[in-house]
């Protein structure tokens, strides 16, 4: 018998985030992420966080308030019970997320 793991994928155009407002950034970034973004308002940082959070939401619909998701790498894990992979190519970014099972051990 196979254990079903939930996955989420998001493909985002980085250039879509060039002229996004501070209000938009506050809506999708956690407080810690917003402070980091506010230093130089890097649109690729904003696009990356968007793609990751969209993928997390697609894997688990409980995470619909993006500002409550703080994405940072801590002890090889990005966010709670998720494995996250991100890749950039030109103007595109893709985020791939796998939700870990509760009984799955952390390495």
Swiss-Prot record:
This is Holo-[acyl-carrier-protein] synthase. Belongs to the P-Pant transferase superfamily. AcpS family. It is an enzyme of class 2 (transferase). Transfers the 4'-phosphopantetheine moiety from coenzyme A to a Ser of acyl-carrier-protein. Mg(2+) binds at residues 10, 54. Keywords: Cytoplasm, Fatty acid biosynthesis, Fatty acid metabolism, Lipid biosynthesis, Lipid metabolism, Magnesium, Metal-binding, Transferase. The keyword Lipid metabolism applies. The lineage of its organism: Bacteria, Bacillati, Mycoplasmatota, Mycoplasmoidales, Metamycoplasmataceae. Its cofactor is Mg(2+). Its EC number is 2.7.8.7. GO terms for cellular component: cytoplasm. One of its GO terms (molecular function) is holo-[acyl-carrier-protein] synthase activity. It comes from the Bacteria. It catalyses: apo-[ACP] + CoA = holo-[ACP] + adenosine 3',5'-bisphosphate + H(+). GO terms for biological process: fatty acid biosynthetic process. It is found in: Cytoplasm. The keyword NAD does not apply. SUPFAM superfamilies: 4'-phosphopantetheinyl transferase. InterPro entries: 4-PPantetheinyl_Trfase_dom, 4-PPantetheinyl_Trfase_dom_sf, ACPS, Ppantetheine-prot_Trfase_dom. Pfam families: ACPS.
């Amino acid at each position: 018998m196979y254990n079903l793991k939930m996955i989420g994928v998001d493909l985002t155009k980085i250039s879509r985030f060039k002229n996004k407002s501070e209000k938009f950034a506050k809506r999708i970034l956690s407080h810690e992420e917003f402070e980091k973004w506010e230093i130089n308002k890097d649109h690729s940082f904003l696009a990356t966080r968007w793609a990751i959070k969209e993928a997390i939401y697609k894997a688990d619909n409980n995470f619909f308030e993006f500002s409550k998701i703080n994405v940072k790498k801590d002890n090889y894990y990005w966010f709670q019970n998720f494995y996250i992979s991100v890749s950039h190519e030109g103007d595109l970014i893709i985020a791939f997320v796998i939700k870990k099972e509760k009984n799955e051990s952390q390495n």
